[in-house]
């Protein structure tokens, strides 16, 4: 089968379908990582999005059993230049094509991903549809663009409830006792906490502050997740109540939630930061780290001036806020992903810093 990808600016490309023969819609974004397609596909922060990989070949090592960041493919659709159909890693269980088929997610191959990336970089992330079709039944351009016009904007989607756990569960035993508010948490975050001896309990995004304090945690992590942080009012209110009661760390969406909880504001980035090569400067240490990132929203630095939040990390490329520290309470947050998954391990020490804070308090 064939497939078409249509963007809201009128761009339409045709290619070969792989994965599931169903239609997909969402915000079309790009990731600049050279490897890590499995981690990207299973990252809950990609819910509601059609993902373009800028590196040309994808699928060349197959799907490995221990690598996924969640139990399912989270992207709505997958766009690649070349789909590898040859030998895969000896430990791989299935191919990328089979993986997407199993999870009901369509992909399109054989398209100019460089052109698409340049367009999104210039014009910004935009709505799109991925439509499979038989070669003798190609949809018209107007039909495709009409479908695009019906796609909701990412800020109109309630995505966190779709990816958050529905019931509290225990991930690991140990000390200090950490509660993770699941807004779409990646497994790598839980693994990094457990690796350092922490006891980890995961709770739904809408768990109240009182319910969390009843667990008697030594610290709370507000996880990554998809979409606009202003759509998760319950989590913002919970964090507002927890500040000062227990040490807090936010990651990615959790960074934005901490900012909103203290009266800051967020805004949508033009095309977001998605990849494993984002340089971030730590103003406290006067050092630059290469980080893994996946977000389309950011904290407005001007909105933080009258709040108890101090900017500690900034993006070297565009100057956006990459993390804040609370000046009156044991709390901080980072916009980047210290756990990587995929990406560099330069900032895994952030977990050590947080757990030390939990032990001190």
From Swiss-Prot:
Molecular-function annotations in GO: ATP binding; carbamoyl-phosphate synthase (glutamine-hydrolyzing) activity; glutaminase activity
Pathway per the UniProt entry: Amino-acid biosynthesis; L-arginine biosynthesis; carbamoyl phosphate from bicarbonate: step 1/1; Pyrimidine metabolism; UMP biosynthesis via de novo pathway; (S)-dihydroorotate from bicarbonate: step 1/3
Enzyme class: ligase
An example Gene Ontology biological process: glutamine metabolic process
Alphabetical list of Pfam families matching this protein: CPSase_sm_chain, GATase
Keyword annotations of the record: Amino-acid biosynthesis, Arginine biosynthesis, ATP-binding, Glutamine amidotransferase, Ligase, Nucleotide-binding, Pyrimidine biosynthesis
Catalytic activity: hydrogencarbonate + L-glutamine + 2 ATP + H2O = carbamoyl phosphate + L-glutamate + 2 ADP + phosphate + 2 H(+)
E.C. code: 6.3.5.5
Entry keyword annotation includes Ligase: yes
Binding residues annotated for L-glutamine, in chain numbering: 45, 225, 227, 253, 256, 294, 296-297
UniProt domain Glutamine amidotransferase type-1: residue ranges: 177-361
Domain of life according to the entry: Archaea
Subunit structure as annotated in this protein's UniProt entry: Composed of two chains; the small (or glutamine) chain promotes the hydrolysis of glutamine to ammonia, which is used by the large (or ammonia) chain to synthesize carbamoyl phosphate. Tetramer of heterodimers (alpha,beta)4.
Family: Belongs to the CarA family.
General function of this protein: Small subunit of the glutamine-dependent carbamoyl phosphate synthetase (CPSase). CPSase catalyzes the formation of carbamoyl phosphate from the ammonia moiety of glutamine, carbonate, and phosphate donated by ATP, constituting the first step of 2 biosynthetic pathways, one leading to arginine and/or urea and the other to pyrimidine nucleotides. The small subunit (glutamine amidotransferase) binds and cleaves glutamine to supply the large subunit with the substrate ammonia.
Name assigned to this protein: Carbamoyl phosphate synthase small chain
Organism expressing this protein natively: Methanopyrus kandleri (strain AV19 / DSM 6324 / JCM 9639 / NBRC 100938)
């Amino acid at each position: 089968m064939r497939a078409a990808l249509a963007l809201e600016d009128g761009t339409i490309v045709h290619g070969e379908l792989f994965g599931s023969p169903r239609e997909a819609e969402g915000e079309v974004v790009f990731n600049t990582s050279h490897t890590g397609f499995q981690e990207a596909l299973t990252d809950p922060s990609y819910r509601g999005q059609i993902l373009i990989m800028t590196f040309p070949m994808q699928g060349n090592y197959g799907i490995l059993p221990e690598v996924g960041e969640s139990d399912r493919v989270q992207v709505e659709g997958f766009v690649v230049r070349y789909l590898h159909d040859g030998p895969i890693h000896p430990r791989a269980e299935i191919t990328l094509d089979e993986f997407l088929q199993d999870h009901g997610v369509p992909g399109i191959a054989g398209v100019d991903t460089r052109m698409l990336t340049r367009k999104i970089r210039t014009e910004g992330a935009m709505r799109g549809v991925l439509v499979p079709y038989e070669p003798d039944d190609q949809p018209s351009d107007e039909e495709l663009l009409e479908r695009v016009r019906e796609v909701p904007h990412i800020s109109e989607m309630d995505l966190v409830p779709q990816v958050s756990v529905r019931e509290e569960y225990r991930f690991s035993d140990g000390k200090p006792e950490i509660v993770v508010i699941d807004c779409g948490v990646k497994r790598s975050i839980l693994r990094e906490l457990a690796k350092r001896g922490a006891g980890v309990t995961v709770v739904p995004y809408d768990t109240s502050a009182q319910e969390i304090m009843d667990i008697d945690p030594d610290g709370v992590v507000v996880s990554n997740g998809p979409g606009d942080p202003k759509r998760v009012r319950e989590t913002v209110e919970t964090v507002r109540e927890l500040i000062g009661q227990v040490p807090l760390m936010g990651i990615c969406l959790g960074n934005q939630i901490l900012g909103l909880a203290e009266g800051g504001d967020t805004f949508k980035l033009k095309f977001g930061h998605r990849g494993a090569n984002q340089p971030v400067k730590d103003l406290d240490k006067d050092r630059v780290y290469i980080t893994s990132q996946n977000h389309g929203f950011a904290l407005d630095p001007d909105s933080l001036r009258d709040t108890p939040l101090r900017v500690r990390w900034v993006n070297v490329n565009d100057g956006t806020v990459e993390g804040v520290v609370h000046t009156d309470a044991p709390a901080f947050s980072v916009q980047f992903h210290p756990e990587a998954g995929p990406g560099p391990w330069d900032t895994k020490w952030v977990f050590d810093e947080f757990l030390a804070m939990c032990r001190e308090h």
